Amino acid sequence: MFVNLHTNSYYNFLNSTLSPQKLVDLAVQDQQVAVCLTDPNLFGATEFFLACQKAHIKPLIGLSVTVRHYEQNVNLLVIAQTNRGYQNLMCLALVKDQPDLQLEPFLDGNVVIICTQTELRLNTANPVYLAHGLSGRYPKIAVTQKPVKCQNTNKDLTLLLTLKQISQINSEHFQPLEWKLSRSLNEIQLDPPLLQQLRHQPFLSQKAAQQIFSEEELGNLQKLVEQSQWDLTKLKASSLQVSHNDAQMLSEQCQLALTEFLKLNPQLNKQLYEERLAKELEIINSLHFASYFLVVSDLVQFAHNNDILIGPGRGSAVGSLVAFLLKITQIDPVANNLIFERFISRHRQGLPDIDIDIMETKRDLVIDYVMQKYGREQCAQIVTFQKFKTRSALRDVGKVFNHIEGAEDLLGKLPKDKSLLELDVNGVTDPVLQLSLKSFRLLWEVAREIINFPRQPSIHASGVVIVTEPLITTIPLMVGNNNNYVTQVSMDWLEWYNLNKFDLLGLINLTMIHEVVQAVKPKEVSVQQFLQQIPLDDEATFTNLTNQATLGVFQLESFGMKKVLKQIKPHNLHDLAIVLALYRPGPQDNINTFIANRNLGFDTSDIDPRILPILKETYGVLIFQEQVINIAKTVANYSLETADSFRRAISKKNLQVIQDNMRSFYEGALANNFSLKAATTIFNYIQRFAGYGFNLSHALGYALLSYWTAWLKTHYFEQFNLWWLNHEQGKKEKQKQLLNEFISSGYEICPPLINKAKSDFSVQDKKLYLGFKLINGIGDKQAHALEHVQEVLKQNPNLSLIATVNLCLSKTVGGLELKDITLLQQAGCFNCFNYTVDFNLAKSFWVQSNHELFPKIPLDQPPVINWKSFGF
């Protein structure tokens, strides 16, 4: 028996091209009974373990670390023998890069193996002597001395010396081969017959190992493998629990909120809301999700209390009355016929997923609150990986080959809708591209190999994990920004560990809403209160939407969206939700049908009257997932949970799954007095549209956000457009459109007059002043200096042009340079002065001083706006 102990995956960034799955596949192909992963991190551990579990092969996990010994760096492998050892490995991964690393605290349940490196050549150090020296630090360790030549490499002889704790393995020596995969991006640079090397897996087979090692050594390796018991399934987190009576706490909070809500809305059906709340709480508590809702509620409450604007809701969570009562969402799910079971169902495995939109500028405050409230040990942000894409792969490989022009040539000829993975040199019909691919075939084929490989770790833009016990006991961590922990497990695997993920998404539109409302609201009203008072039936707002005045309006700016708005002519929030749902690939085909049915009426003769009310609200077109659920419930007499499971199954397009569900649907329909013909017609109709159905809960949440922005644009046009002008720096095309809207609305566009303008765009008395910072060559420092000059001008409004220029040049006031003054003059900053008088005097003054400051310009009128000065 043989097992490769030193193997790297592509999570040892730029040092391997083996995915954890490929590593397992290699071991399976050679009929090895176990496989080991020893990256310098634990990013791939979960993926590796699950791949081993699926392949029925024993996994061994280790960590490559470096320690200092007698002024030398020594590479070691620390391999976990037990789950306790793996937990120590996770702790070690957190601190392994610290100077003067001491391994002793992390060795319980682990084996240490010396892994020689290029620094420890036979002619510069005696690895055997080194190993004996290390054994002084790690008592009761035995050492072997047999040198092993690494195959398929021209590198020096490599020694592998094994140190093992006598208490865990008997004193017999064994010597497994250290074999670092040579299929690596790093070696691409060192060894240019590289395509051959990329295709060759330097993974020692059992047959080759038997020729290198003695039976005694292989037997000892077998003992190590047999004694290693690593099982991630036993390290899953327990359910999130913020209190021993979390279910009671949630119920009390919701009951109190419902009482207040019904008091403010006495016209509502009290029994309907109470029954809905009781049902939701029963499902939530049966699945042990109460703490999850309490945590989200706490985050939202913190935001409300600290003037941090939260979105009205996104995703299927908008369909929850509990979420609505806790102010997590702002759409009444009962009034809007939303379905809770689309969000949480006992028929569906998985944790709840509530995404919170937060104003972008204050998102970090919420994350800081999470860390302080629940503890640094119990919280972490989530790792993500930047991956090689077509362009980055070609360019990076081009650099390795010193063939940048070849990479750029390929990129220039590559169809925009194709990736390298989709191209076959023999199947390309474009002769120009075919010639390019053949000319740079090696470059192309190597780049293809690394597409979608992880390049480096990063931090997920929104994800946060919160648990009630130290996170390091379940998953590996690393230290990220602000000294906060970051998981070494990506988003894809968190739920497998039973870890609750909270998405806190920064949204610039919420920042805009907050700052615009802050500028226009009465002082005694909060931003949230102001938004809640916005009428949802404002005719002027819907007229603007129909007229396509949507520049800066959330989700509705694109040409396609404007076209749909003009056709549909929305007049309520539900219409806006339909617009958002229809303008997507797939459903777009139904836009014309929907508009025709809406404007001209639609034939209801083929629609069973029992499902007509469900389709009537969308004029006979199946648009929303909730409609599929309600139809399945009505026809097949399913519960809402079963109906949602049916919807999910049908949408997957799996023929066997569809047939299984078709049978149960027909049985339910026939038992519910539907004919086979009617049931077949309805099922086929559902099957046709189910894959494109949109979540009504999400659509309504985002429709409200779109409406808020449209209402602000309609009633506070100046503040709305001005905000976007000042926050779209670098997007000149959008700024041009915003400026044109100002002109169309009767505003005069003025140069950045030195006595009126600000650093950014500003408005006074229907005059829009360009900002100092917009002038090419003028930065924040100069713009701030000009505002300082402006303060002096306010106190001395009759200062001449010469005096003003001197102020700008004064080191105590402006501190600008002559070149800055020229830029200001060209941009029209001095147009506020009497052109025929002040400019003649100024030019005369500067000519006498031997300074030709101002360019030659007509003296009878100030220059028009020189848009080139502003990059337009």
UniProtKB/Swiss-Prot annotation:
| Listed GO MF terms | 3'-5' exonuclease activity; DNA-directed DNA polymerase activity
The similarity comment for this entry is:
Belongs to the DNA polymerase type-C family. DnaE subfamily.
Q: How does it assemble?
A: DNA polymerase III contains a core (composed of alpha, epsilon and theta chains) that associates with a tau subunit. This core dimerizes to form the PolIII' complex. PolIII' associates with the gamma complex (composed of gamma, delta, delta', psi and chi chains) and with the beta chain to form the complete DNA polymerase III complex.
- Source superkingdom: Bacteria
| Any one annotated GO CC term | cytoplasm
Where in the cell? Answer: Cytoplasm
Provide the protein name. DNA polymerase III subunit alpha
Write out the catalysed reaction: DNA(n) + a 2'-deoxyribonucleoside 5'-triphosphate = DNA(n+1) + diphosphate
* Enzyme superclass (EC): transferase
Key word Transferase present in the record? yes
Q: Which UniProt keywords apply?
A: Cytoplasm, DNA replication, DNA-directed DNA polymerase, Nucleotidyltransferase, Transferase
CDD domains in alphabetical order: PHP_PolIIIA
Provide the function of this protein.
DNA polymerase III is a complex, multichain enzyme responsible for most of the replicative synthesis in bacteria. This DNA polymerase also exhibits 3' to 5' exonuclease activity. The alpha chain is the DNA polymerase.
> What is the primary gene name for this protein?
dnaE
**Pfam families linked:** DNA_pol3_alpha (PF07733), DNA_pol3_finger (PF17657), HHH_6 (PF14579), PHP (PF02811)
What's any GO biological process attached to this entry?
Answer: DNA replication
The organism encoding this protein is Mycoplasma pneumoniae (strain ATCC 29342 / M129 / Subtype 1) (Mycoplasmoides pneumoniae)
Give the enzyme's EC designation.
2.7.7.7
